[in-house]
Structures are given as C-alpha cells and as structure tokens.
Swiss-Prot record:
Mg(2+) binds at residues 285, 287. InterPro entries: ATP-grasp, ATP_grasp_subdomain_1, PreATP-grasp_dom_sf, PRibGlycinamid_synth_ATP-grasp, PRibGlycinamide_synth, PRibGlycinamide_synth_C-dom, PRibGlycinamide_synth_C_sf, PRibGlycinamide_synth_CS. The keyword Signal does not apply. Its cofactor is Mg(2+); Mn(2+). It comes from Nostoc sp. (strain PCC 7120 / SAG 25.82 / UTEX 2576). Binds 1 Mg(2+) or Mn(2+) ion per subunit. Residues 109-315 form the ATP-grasp domain. This is Phosphoribosylamine--glycine ligase. Keywords: ATP-binding, Ligase, Magnesium, Manganese, Metal-binding, Nucleotide-binding, Purine biosynthesis. The lineage of its organism: Bacteria, Bacillati, Cyanobacteriota, Cyanophyceae, Nostocales. SUPFAM superfamilies: Glutathione synthetase ATP-binding domain-like, PreATP-grasp domain, Rudiment single hybrid motif.
Amino acid sequence: MKVLVVGNGGREHALAWKLLQSPQIEQVACVPGNGGTATLARCQNVSLAVDDFEGISQYALNQGFSLVVVGPEVPLAKGITDYLQEKGLMVFGPSRAGAQIEASKAWAKALMQEAGIPTAKAAVFTEAAAAKSYIQAQGAPIVVKADGLAAGKGVTVATTIEQAQSAIDAIFQGQFGSAGEFVVIEECLTGQEVSVLALTDGLTIRPLLPAQDHKRIGEGDTGENTGGMGAYAPAPIATPELMALVQTEVLERAIATLQSKGIDYRGVLYAGLMITPNGDFKVLEFNCRFGDPETQVILPLLATPLEELILACVQQRLGELPPIAWQGGASATVVAASGGYPGDYEKGQVITGIPQAEATGATVFHAGTKLNAQQQIVTDGGRVLNVTGIGENFQQALAQAYTGIKAIDFSGIYYRRDIGYRVNS
C-alpha cells in the first residue's frame, strides 16, 4: 500500500516513520515534507503546497497512492478531505464541517455546551466595546481567544484587565486576519494541561496515550506561548479513572453531537484538557488533527500497526478492532528551536550532529528543516528538530532525549532544559 502524508513538520515525519515500520506499506510520499522525510528509506518528498488540492489529488491518483493522511489543521479547515474524497481517494482527517471543531472556537464552545461536555464558562463577541465591558464585569485573570486558526498564537491568558483589552484590540484590528472576526472570552482555569488524542471512525472513538506538552518558550513555563517545546507520554496525571470519565463525558459526547449535526467525523479528535487541583477536568479546546509534538511521543510507544488503525477509521470499522496495543515504558521529546523563536529567527543554518544523536539511541524527528543545494540539512523554521527518547521510565526516556539533543548543533540553537520536570523527580 502507498500512503501520502500531507504536511512538513515533526508530526508528519513521525507519521511517515511509523507507517514505514509496517511491511504492508510499500511507499510513503510527504507533501511537501522536510529534510528528515527526504532521507527516510521508501519515502519521497513532493514539492506541492498543502492547500494545492488539485495538485495533491492528481499526484496521488497518477502515482497509485490510495490513502491520504492529513497532518495540519489548515488544509482540513479548507476542505481537503471533501475535495480528495470526491476524487475517489481515502482520506484520514475530518471534513471541512468537522474541522470547524478547531477552526472556530465559538463553534466548538457551542458544541461543548450542547453536548454537556465540561468546559470553561465563556462568552462570544463580534465587537470590541461589548467584549471590553464584559471583561470589566468579570475581572482578571481571564482568557481572550481569537475565534479562528492562528497557529497556536491566538490565545492570551491576561493577568490584568488592561492586558485583556489590549488582546481584544489586537484581534479586532486584524492581527490574526479572518481568525479575528469573533473573540471568545473564557474564565481562567488553573491546573495542569493534558492532551488526549483519540482516533474515531465517526461511530467509535478510542483514545491514544495521554500526553503533556510544554507550550511556553522559557524554562519553568515562562515567556511566550509556542507550538510546543517538548512533551512526554503517558501523562501520569491522566489516571485510568480520569481517562474513563474523559471517554464517556468528552469523547463519546462529542462524537454523538457531531453525528446529530450530520457530521461524519473520521480522523483524530484531540481534546486539550485542564485538570484542576481538586482532580476535576474541563475541556479547553478541541483540535481536529494529531498534536505536535505529542505525536512524536505517542507513536514510538504504539504497538498496533498505525495503518491498521487509520484504515479502520477511514472505512468505519474501528469498533471491530481489538483494543489498541502499547509497548510499556515512557517516551519524551525535546524540541530544538531557532534562536528568536517564537519571534523572528534566521533560516538556512547548517545543522550538525544528527547521526551522532541517533547513535545514542534517540530518534530525531525533523520539523523546520530542508536540504540545501549542497544536500546539507539546514534550518527552515522556528521549531527545527524533535529529539525523542524512550525508556522503561521517564528518567530513562528524558536522559536519552537530552543525551541526543546535546550532540546536535546549529547557529542559535535553543531548547528547554526542564522538559518533563513534573515527572523527572
């Protein structure tokens, strides 16, 4: 079988890497891929944009790729699944209607309220004045969110009313483009965030291992939000008892409510949870795709062949499969970023030490990398590499990841030294 993976990040490298472990997979193509997928055996990069739906469909059909796995949220929100399915391709990823669960925070909040899913109290506004008067009445701390897709940068946890009002101005003045047509204002929840990614065929939904991400750029969870600076799985705070509640109160309710709206949702449903100090949980957000960097710690522990699960979702027979199997132990990944990220950064810096990192036993997933004219691997984004370790416990997994990342160098390299601080004691 030949599989086409859409995207160019660490998540997509991990998906291609995992798919290629199966003898059932003859070839993987990545659109557009990165420097890591370019060097995988039986994998090739295809120089097309992720929103060039016609080009992707023509390539897949002409080259005999029957299954398309979509990584990022933007093409899903633009309707890539609908387009490719009309051309006769099997697609793993929700339709444009289903992708609203990530593409519109206001739509997702309404769905949660309708479904009875535990979530933060919230209000939605279309003009700045009303939003600001609501904030005056509610007080700070408070959370301000741009409604649409903003690459993880559209959320402000405001500690003062002034900061919240500035965030509202930025959204309505167009900082996030069409993502800022609405603003969602939520109560500020405290506790630990957990990512629960689940696979669904539209009827059955099965969670993967819970993971914890580190979103802030700085050690001690300080500084600006990023796409994620590291992660580990399975997250101990997501106990079996809590996961059983998440299954019934979040995942199954979400799928049932999507069904009631006529939405046949097949792909990943990713619930971002806040676990409060008293052990309760609320859903902060839903995403319509694999998490990044969570995928890079979940897939190394997956024992069931990935393509079996993906095909079962696409063909709506997930309920017929045995429970998802996992190898024991723990997994951790540390993100190497370009200096200056999440602000401005340079591209084109030559990367050294990747073979040495892999020789330590770590797995290096490429994110913002490419091959230059001299066939050297160079930086090509803010988050550059994800160095993943696995072990019998978190101490071993984190030690392997950090031993690996210390072998890697490029001008301006930055990574957090405290990934896994909650579990590495």
